[in-house]
């Protein structure tokens, strides 16, 4: 079942009208994420809530993005002031997912407080547009980055260039000038 949220005409994103990016967190990570940092991710989101962050943006890709969205929804069950913003790069993205991941995606999108669909269909560069949207609307980025090239590296470099705080939950630290957040710190 394709995403059926319509966005017509060149109007400002709802996000731009209501959100405070200074109190927002974005997630970025590899699609190959297998859940190994589930405890660290949950602890990080709880810690960020304790620091006053209430809005969490997920790029809604398979892997770390969906896992992060699910953690935020769990936190929201205990703290109704938490908001999940599902940032979907293009309409129909979920059609490229496995059946199990499609179900997870649709469940998270349906439960999100806000959904931003950035393009009517796939086009070259749409993932970079999504990544820019995430970084530009967050004060802090939580990552699962192992040092490999790709969209996660691009997103973290953009975040660092824009002075965003970055937490990398991957135990290797990923090789960028960011420190990994160790589970023991939580």
Stretches with model-predicted labels:
Residues 1-16:
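N-terminal amphipathic/basic-hydrophobic helices that include classical n-h-c signal peptides
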Residues 12-186:
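Acidic/glycine-enriched connector segments
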